[in-house]
Amino acid sequence: MPNYENLSNTLTAQMEQERQSGNYIKTGFDDRNALRRRADDDDRITIWRPNFAHDIDRIIHCPYYNRYSDKTQVFSLIRNDDITRRSLHVQLVSRIARTIGGALNLNLDLIEAIALGHDMGHTPFAHSGEVYLDELYHAHAGRHFNHSIHSIRVLDGIFPINISLQVLDGIACHNGEIELEEYTPVPLTSFEDFDAMIESCYLDK
């Protein structure tokens, strides 16, 4: 069985050599293939602002991003200044995701944008709050509430800030293994397919 905590000396030396020389195979998504709902001069790629860097900037400047700081991960019945808030959770997810992505030579800006936006639509009180809101929403509207799908509503509806399809898809699918018990990526090639997928998530839990 593979040991993912310790790499062989040969592989470690190879990775170190590739890192120092900059000569390694890039397996990450190519920025030039990012899709957006509308063409915008503000999205032009420059040497210091690759495509997904625009998404990072737009997410952290979205008014709802500030709400991370006031949402706790759990509901506490006692005063606790050190209780974890969603802002710290998002920072940790971003850091861990970038570490893993860097080892795999993936697109780190794409990874960071997904990580920073992945809980934008989350309720307070962690998944218990989400479950309760889903029950209320479905009882009154016949539709389901899912925090990852609500994150899409925030970034693509409430604030239509032209986030790329690749980032939105990553946010929408970030907890698919919880709902489905497994996650098999399905490539998306258009916003039409993406919108149909999002609508199906409201109707089918």
What does each model-found stretch correspond to?
Residues V74-L77, I111, S151, D169:
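Residue-level signal for alpha-helical context at structural boundaries
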Residues P2-R44, H61-N66, R95, A103, ...:
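Sequence-structural signature of the catalytic-core scaffold of metal-dependent phosphohydrolases
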Residues E112-G117, G121:
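Short alpha-helix carrying the canonical HExxH Zn2+-binding catalytic motif
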Residues W48, D82-V90, G121-H122, H140-H144:
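Short secondary-structure transition/capping motifs
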Residues D70-F75, L106-I111, S128-V131:
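Short amphipathic alpha-helical segments, especially helix-boundary/capping motifs
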